[in-house]
Amino acid sequence: MSILERGLGVGELLTSMSQRDQLVALARTLHREGYNDHATGHITIRQPNNTFLVNPFELTWDELRSSDILEMDDQGNQLSGKYSITPAITLHIELHKARHDLHVALHGHPQWATAWASALRIPPIYDQTSALAGNNVVLYNAYGGSVDAVEQARSAVLAMGTSHTALLAHHGVFVAAESVSLAYMWASTIEWRARRAWQVEALGGTKSIDDKVVESLHEFVISNISQFPTFEAAIRAELRHDPNMFA
C-alpha cells in the first residue's frame, strides 16, 4: 500500500520517512512555494551522529530524490554522495556550530521575499497566515558578497540571534529550525507574507496586525506544530506528481 493510500493521521507520514526523505520533501514542497531560482539554494539536516545531510549543488530542488542526498561532516567535508556540495555551505556550518538546538537550515532566493530583502525592508504582517511565523525575522544588511566567507557567515549567524528567519540584503532568505516541519512553516510563511504584503501595499496599504495577536498565533504554532497538517499535505501533493521522489 502506498503512502497516499494509508490514511495516516497528522504526523504519521513524517514519522514513517527517513531523514533523507524529509530533506527531499522539504526541497520539493518549498520549490513549489517559490524557492525555485534554478539550482541555487541549499538545505542541511543534522543527523544523530552530528554529520549532516545536504542537497547536491548540481540539482534543482524539484528534481531531487532521496538517493541524490549527500552527507558531510561538521566542517563541510563530503562523506558520501555522487554529486558535490555547494561552495556556499559555510553559512550552514557556522549556524550549526553556534546553535546545537537547530537541526535544519535552508537558504534560497524565493521571488517575493528576495524582493523585500533587496529593498532592505521586512514585509509587514497584514493577514493571519503571515502571522503564523511571528515577528521573528531579521534583516541582515551587511551582505557584501558571497556568504562562503567564514567571517561573513559568522556575522550573519550572530545577527540572527534567536530569530528563525533572516532576510539577507540583496540576496535571499535564510531559515533555521528545530525540525523539518518548522523549517517548512517558517520558509513557506515568509514567502507568503512577502507576497501578501506587496499586494496589500499595491492597493494602498493598511494597518498591520497587532504585535500581540501575531505573537499569540506564533506561540500557538510552536506549541502545536505536530498537529499542523500543512507540510504533510504538501508532501502528498508532491508524491502525486512524482511517486518515485523517495527512490
Q: Can you annotate each of these PLM segments?
A:
Residues M1-A247:
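Glycine-rich flexible loops
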